[in-house]
């Protein structure tokens, strides 16, 4: 049996809710519970609190098993009532803990029940049906089906009864009481004349006699009533038995009327919506094509034919149409393999969506292990996912799975301490995450026969396309926050006000808090007023080169792009520093929410290192009165002893954050003087403008406070060195709270001038100097004094008008910052002090800092010296001194004296209310990549998508490295999907061209009456079925063997070249002769000499024989060269706003940039190197340059699947080009000989040719030297960039030949030592050194080469692999190719 491809799986233990005395309030085990996934939460409701193994799911069976279990147990409760729960629990997939929703005792709620269904939509849970206790006989209640429909508002935490179902006997639209049914959401009720409404589809189930129900009902969630005059049925027939047999509809289990029953234990159901924009239609008639279908997975009879197990029912304008089996990709070569992959008759199946894929989980017949299958709708291909866990095989037992769209994973829930039980018994203590595969969405034209995206529809233009949205969706369009968990489960519920978890904690509803945002952007009187919905789809058009659309809704993308491009400087409080020295300001809230756990760990380490260094400096003998005052002492002391804080009005505030600050604790502030407008102020992150105004106004009340002239804050002057004056310097009034005793000797600066500074002109963007070297700007970080403050990110700047883009990114403040870091009021690690150990040994409680190995370059996001984060929390006397030189054991720290201040006391701290000291928070993070790459990474963090203008190198490739090494899995999946699509398009192109070439060749042979051997195989036939099995989830052993064989052949060839000796002068002359005669036909002897010269040339460039040198040569990592001269310059806005230039310098810089861009366009320099993403995916045949880039990057990130695909593609490309050149040469020879022969002698020639062919086939063991035609045929036009068939391929220098793939052993070796070695430049391995081109041209090309480009070879000159260089140099006769290839 084939092996499944290993997947990125992870197993986690889950924390159960607190144990209660009543077992119905616990979540230990459940039977018949209902569950669903919404956003990043899994909800579980109801069920029995004991595990029962049910087989047929009938009421008599349930009662029998239950009472048998109770009678043999020692429980004192003997009735169902004591075991039937009605509680609602939810699992946070981020925090990995279960919680119970606590309601008031008197609030209405559904009755406890089991075998019911729940689903989630638009911040609400919906519950229907199930088995509940009857109320007719209170003495002996029994389980009966019910048909009541409930809604649970996640905002209000309140249950609402939508319909009690009492009139189902009078109204056919009301569903009858049922259990064991299914429930799903329909986004449009167009068949019921309510296309703008959405509703619930209640399917199947069993009645009170446990008989199957074939009636289905639909509930309108807008009008809150059932629709239709009669039940809806799922009809699995076309009316023609013959057609049903052909399509496979007769295979589905149904009743005699061909109605399908949907059962919880055998079926899965989901709705799929496809929106196709139609720009040519009038907007007032039909804004979009809204295609919705109900897809049902059901049991089949399996008569032997390979049919799909999914049937689709299209929701039409007037009715739900008959079923249609989803097409299945068929191929005669892999028919048996495909039949083994298709999941038939799964038990307890659940279905979900991921892009264009249907994710199906369930249990195969006679198996207790859960399985995961993925069906790709455009291609019709099934694949199976491998479920891997580091624990012992079979130690876990999972009962069900959910598709977690926003994180591209499948979630499995179960237990590790159970026996072999079915999904009827459910436990909740273990969670396993399985990464969903990234398939070739761009190769759909090859597999789906034209049903996929084509080249012209790769992008939706910024035109008049609109998305159709209903009223209810419009109500929640703008409820998208920056949090990643706001992504939703399906495309119709694309934006929620909060994550479901935060919604559950909200005390008041927020459903319509931002509905007014739908007002027109223009004036009410303007005839061209544009709604926000129209603007959203203009600013964030939907792209078709990626199917992962659930990361963020268009509204969040639009708001994020505006925040990044327009007000990114104003809301930023951290800077990302590139290897070019440029600084990109970014908000730490965005980094924490979008980057996630890895950044939080880095920030925690950096903060703890800063605190530890401060603690160390204090313990080394600093005076007691020079220590930082604690926040508690500041708040408890009187105003006469310690002055209060002083805040000033700041224009850099983000008004949209006011809602967040309303929930946070306010600070009581007072001030001695209202700050002057031109006095630089310190800034703290995320202070609300309204709060600043109130504080500023409130500060007037404290002007007359009696401070004896000592009105300086301890955070500004903790040592009470000098009183503050009204017009003091920026240093005196804005010192950091970390200034220690060695700063008190710095003399004060002179007062600022009394005259008012003119307002800063409102320029369109913010600028800083292009180079920070020798900068004498007063705000430059190179200044000797301000450099001390720059490392703390407290750079004083003057206040600017509100309209100015130069306004401060954070509110200004002078005074102690205790308790004011509202940004970091979220739960943060509770840490204990470090005694005698380096800061790196600190661990945090709330977050697992050991979750994977953090790269050494990232561990230093701290105050210490590092290559990743150059942050210094306390200015030292020797900035170059190492922290490790401090002897931690040379002094004894006094715990009592050290923890008398709240900053350093981490004991007994409430993580919910913990606030970090702003002056100790690291403010710069160095990322060792180029500015374009870092800026693109920030763009992804703000928008959640990949920009179509990203350069392939270095931007896209470097971001793949960032996502791998710095753990950004969503970005890795987005890039991988695009790269696999590019690989797939190239594969499909080559296979398509090979088929065309084969058809032309065979047509010519038939026209010339040349017989074709029935056993003959075309050279490219081995790849014909490759795309049929490439994404089936199984490991391609043939591909691994092929890669290993190619690597072995490559190494053998290189060793053979080393043993060849030659004369270097003779080599040079022959190379020169070969380069000057590249356009003429060489004689046979000249070709042989050229081959020898190439061997000698390779030998002269082979220095070391070590294995690592071989690897370095095989993997020419030229793409890591740090040469960025030809990269397009970034706008000044991408640089920090704290180093500024005059307007004249700004205009000059813009002119230089424009001139450079115009010159680049005119000259056409580096056009291939500057290929963008939209150009890459729009091409039918991506260049070999792009494939080489993907191959090298896959090597660095050790993505085995991508690496094998690219290596196979490179070998496929080389073989196809060699085959095409030889075949076209043979075709030219045949055509010429046919034209030169007289008509009477053709038959004789054909007879001789047949005899020659037979003699060649009989002597397979002996080598046959191909014959050479002595007559030169007429020249033929070159096809698809391939050289003329008469042009010898042997003239190409070997440096331009495509490199061969490597074996897995060498790849593993590279993975062990190349990850960080690759971050240095590899200038000695550039393939241009092997080129025979002119030296001046080569030097110019190297100067303008991208910093991360592998090769700059012309793909039209690429030839066959190294193993076939000599064989390709020999001319073949008419039938020589056939004989040689068959052998």
Swiss-Prot record:
Q: Which UniProt keywords apply?
A: Cytoplasm, Kelch repeat, Meiosis, Repeat, Sporulation, Virulence
Q: Name where it's found.
A: Cytoplasm
**Entry protein name:** Negative regulator of sporulation MDS3
Q: Where is this region: Disordered?
A: 450-506, 625-644, 653-825, 858-884, 1063-1114, 1251-1289, 1321-1369
Bias (Low complexity) ranges: 631-644, 726-758, 803-815, 858-874, 1251-1280
Q: Which gene encodes it?
A: MDS3
**Residues of the signal peptide:** none
Query: What are the ranges of the Kelch repeats?
Result: 124-179, 199-246, 356-402
Give me any GO biological process, just one.
cell redox homeostasis
Q: Which GO terms describe its molecular function?
A: peroxidase activity
Q: How does it assemble?
A: Interacts with SIT4.
Bias (Polar residues) ranges: 450-460, 1341-1352
Q: Would you name any one GO CC term? A: cytosol
Q: Which Gene3D superfamilies does this one have?
A: Kelch-type beta propeller
Record note on disruption phenotype? Results in attenuated keratomycosis.
The protein's role, per its UniProt record? Negatively regulates early sporulation-specific genes. TOR signaling pathway component that contributes to morphogenesis as a regulator of this key morphogenetic pathway. Required for growth and hyphal formation at pH 9, for full virulence in a mouse model of systemic infection and for biofilm formation. Involved in chlamydospore formation, distinctive morphological feature of the fungal pathogen C.albicans that can be induced to form in oxygen-limited environments and has been reported in clinical specimens.
Q: Please indicate which superkingdom the organism of origin belongs to.
A: Eukaryota
What are the Basic and acidic residues biased-composition ranges?
Answer: 693-707, 1084-1094
Tell me yes or no: is Ion transport among this UniProt entry's keywords.
no
């Amino acid at each position: 049996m084939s092996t499944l491809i290993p997947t990125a799986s992870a197993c986690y233990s889950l924390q159960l809710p607190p144990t209660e005395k009543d077992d119905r309030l616990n979540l230990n085990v459940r039977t018949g519970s209902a569950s669903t996934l919404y956003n990043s939460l899994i909800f579980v409701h109801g069920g029995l609190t004991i595990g029962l193994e049910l087989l047929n799911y009938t009421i008599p069976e349930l009662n029998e098993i239950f009472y048998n279990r109770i009678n043999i147990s020692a429980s004192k409760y003997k009735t169902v009532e004591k075991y039937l729960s009605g509680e609602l629990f939810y699992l946070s997939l981020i925090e990995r803990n279960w919680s119970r929703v606590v309601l008031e005792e008197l609030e209405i709620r559904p009755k406890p029940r089991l075998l019911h269904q729940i689903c989630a939509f638009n911040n609400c849970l919906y519950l229907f049906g199930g088995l509940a206790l009857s109320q007719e006989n209170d003495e002996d209640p029994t389980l009966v089906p019910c048909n009541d429909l409930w809604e649970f508002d996640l905002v209000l935490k309140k249950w609402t009864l939508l319909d009690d179902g009492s009139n189902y006997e009078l109204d056919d639209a009301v569903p009858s009481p049922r259990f064991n049914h299914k429930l799903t959401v329909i986004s449009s009720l167009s068949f019921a004349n309510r296309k703008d409404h959405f509703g619930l589809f209640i399917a199947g189930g069993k009645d009170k006699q446990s008989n199957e129900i074939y009636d289905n009902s639909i509930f309108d969630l807008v009008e809150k009533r059932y629709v239709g005059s009669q039940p809806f049925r799922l009809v699995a027939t076309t009316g023609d038995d013959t057609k049903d047999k052909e399509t496979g509809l007769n295979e589905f289990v149904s009743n005699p009327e061909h109605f399908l029953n949907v059962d919880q234990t055998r079926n899965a159901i989901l709705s799929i919506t496809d929106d196709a924009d139609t720009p040519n239609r009038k907007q007032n008639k039909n804004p979009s094509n809204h295609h919705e279908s109900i897809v049902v997975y059901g049991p089949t009879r399996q008569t032997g034919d390979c049919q799909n197990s999914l049937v689709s029912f299209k929701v039409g304008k007037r009715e739900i149409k008959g079923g249609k089996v989803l097409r299945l990709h068929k191929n005669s070569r892999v028919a048996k393999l495909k039949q083994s992959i298709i999941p038939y008759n799964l038990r307890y199946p659940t279905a979900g969506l991921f892009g264009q894929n249907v994710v199906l989980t369930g249990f195969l017949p006679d198996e207790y292990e859960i399985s995961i299958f993925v069906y790709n709708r455009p291609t019709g291909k099934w694949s199976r996912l491998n479920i891997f866990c580091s624990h012992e095989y079979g130690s876990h037992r999972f009962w069900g799975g959910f598709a977690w769209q926003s994180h591209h994973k499948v979630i499995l829930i179960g237990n590790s301490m159970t026996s072999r039980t079915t999904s009827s018994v459910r436990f909740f203590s273990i969670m396993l995450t399985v990464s969903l595969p990234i398939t070739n969405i761009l190769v759909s034209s090859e597999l789906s026969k034209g049903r996929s995206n084509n080249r012209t529809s790769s992008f939706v233009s910024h035109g008049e396309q609109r998305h159709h949205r209903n009223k209810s969706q419009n109500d929640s369009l703008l409820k998208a926050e920056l949090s990643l968990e706001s992504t939703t489960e399906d495309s119709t519920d694309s934006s929620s006000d909060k994550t479901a978890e935060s919604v559950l904690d909200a005390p008041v509803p927020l459903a319509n808090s931002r509905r007014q945002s739908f007002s027109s952007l223009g004036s009410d009187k303007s005839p061209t007023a544009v709604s926000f919905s129209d603007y959203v789809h203009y600013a964030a058009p939907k792209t078709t080169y990626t199917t992962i659309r659930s990361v963020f809704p268009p509204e969040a993308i639009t708001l994020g792009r505006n925040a990044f491009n327009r007000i990114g400087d104003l809301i930023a409080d951290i800077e990302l520093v590139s290897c070019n020295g440029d600084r990109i300001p970014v908000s730490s809230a965005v980094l924490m929410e979008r980057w996630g756990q890895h950044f939080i760990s880095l920030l925690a380490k950096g903060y703890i290192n800063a605190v530890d260094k401060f603690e160390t400096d204090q313990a080394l003998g600093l005076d007691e009165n020079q220590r930082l005052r604690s926040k508690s002492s500041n708040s408890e002391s009187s105003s006469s002893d310690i002055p209060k804080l002083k805040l000033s009005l700041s224009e850099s505030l983000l008004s949209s954050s006011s809602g967040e600050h309303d929930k946070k604790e306010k600070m009581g502030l007072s001030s001695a003087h209202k700050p002057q407008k031109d006095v630089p102020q310190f800034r703290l992150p995320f202070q609300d403008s309204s709060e600043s105004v109130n504080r500023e106004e409130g500060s007037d009340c404290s002007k007359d406070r009696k401070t004896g002239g000592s009105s300086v804050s301890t955070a500004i002057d903790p040592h009470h060195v000098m009183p503050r004056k009204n017009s003091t310097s920026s240093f005196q009034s804005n010192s950091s709270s970390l200034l220690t005793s060695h700063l008190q000797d710095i003399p004060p600066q002179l007062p600022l001038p009394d005259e008012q500074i003119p307002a800063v002109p409102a320029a369109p963007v913010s600028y800083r100097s292009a180079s920070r070297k020798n900068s004498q700007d007063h705000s430059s970080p190179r200044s000797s004094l301000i450099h001390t403050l720059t490392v703390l990110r407290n750079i004083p700047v003057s206040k600017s008008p509100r309209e100015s883009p130069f306004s401060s990114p954070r509110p200004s403040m002078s005074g102690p910052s205790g308790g004011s870091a509202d940004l970091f009021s979220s739960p943060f690690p509770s840490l204990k002090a470090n005694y005698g150990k380096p800061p790196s040994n600190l661990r945090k409680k709330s977050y697992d800092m050991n979750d994977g190995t953090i790269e050494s370059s990232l561990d230093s996001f701290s105050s210490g010296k590092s290559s990743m984060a150059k942050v210094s929390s306390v200015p030292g006397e020797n900035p170059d001194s190492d922290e490790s030189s401090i002897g931690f054991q040379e002094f004894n720290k006094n715990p009592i004296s050290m923890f008398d201040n709240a900053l350093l006391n981490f004991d007994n701290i409430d993580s919910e209310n913990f606030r970090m000291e702003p002056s100790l928070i690291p403010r710069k993070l160095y990322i060792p990549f180029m500015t374009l790459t870092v800026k693109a990474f920030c763009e992804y963090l703000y928008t959640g998508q990949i920009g179509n203008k990203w350069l392939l190198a270095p931007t896209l490739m470097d971001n793949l490295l960032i996502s791998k090494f710095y753990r950004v899995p969503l970005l890795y999946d987005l890039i991988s999907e695009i790269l696999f699509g590019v690989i797939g398009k190239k594969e499909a192109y080559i296979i398509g061209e090979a088929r065309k070439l084969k058809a032309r060749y065979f047509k010519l042979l038939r026209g010339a009456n040349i017989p074709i051997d029935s056993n003959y195989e075309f050279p490219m036939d081995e790849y014909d079925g490759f795309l049929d099995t490439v994404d089936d989830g199984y490991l391609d052993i043939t591909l691994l063997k092929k890669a290993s064989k190619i690597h072995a052949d490559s190494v053998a060839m290189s060793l053979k070249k080393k043993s060849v000796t030659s004369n270097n002068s003779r080599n040079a002359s022959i190379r020169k002769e070969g380069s000057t005669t590249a356009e003429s036909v060489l004689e046979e002897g000249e070709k042989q000499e050229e081959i020898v010269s190439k061997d000698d040339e390779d030998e002269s460039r082979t220095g070391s024989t070590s294995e690592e040198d071989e690897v370095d040569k095989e993997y020419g990592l030229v793409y890591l060269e740090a040469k960025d001269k030809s990269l397009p310059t970034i706008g000044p806005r991408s640089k920090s706003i704290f180093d500024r230039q005059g307007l004249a310098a700004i205009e000059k810089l813009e002119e230089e940039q424009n001139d450079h861009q115009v010159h680049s366009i005119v000259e056409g320099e580096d056009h291939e190197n500057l290929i963008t993403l939209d150009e890459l995916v729009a091409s039918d045949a991506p260049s070999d340059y792009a494939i080489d880039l993907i191959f090298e990057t896959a090597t660095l990130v050790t993505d085995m699947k991508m690496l094998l695909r690219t290596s196979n593609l490179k070998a496929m490309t080389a073989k196809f080009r060699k085959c095409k050149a030889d075949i076209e040469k043979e075709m030219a020879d045949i055509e010429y000989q046919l034209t030169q022969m007289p008509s009477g002698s053709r038959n004789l020639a054909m007879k001789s040719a047949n005899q020659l062919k037979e003699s060649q086939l009989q002597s397979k063991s002996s080598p046959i030297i191909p014959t050479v035609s002595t007559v030169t045929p007429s020249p033929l036009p070159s096809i698809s960039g391939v050289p003329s068939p008469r042009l010898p391929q042997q003239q190409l220098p070997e440096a331009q030949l495509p490199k061969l793939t490597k074996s897995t052993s060498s790849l593993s070796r590279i993975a062990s030592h190349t990850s960080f070695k690759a971050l240095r430049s590899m200038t000695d391995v550039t393939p241009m050194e092997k080129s025979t081109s002119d030296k001046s041209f080569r030097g110019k090309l190297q100067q303008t080469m991208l910093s991360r480009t592998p090769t700059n070879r012309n793909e039209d000159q690429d030839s066959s692999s190294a193993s076939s260089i000599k064989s390709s140099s020999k001319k073949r006769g008419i039938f020589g190719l056939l004989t040689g290839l068959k052998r």
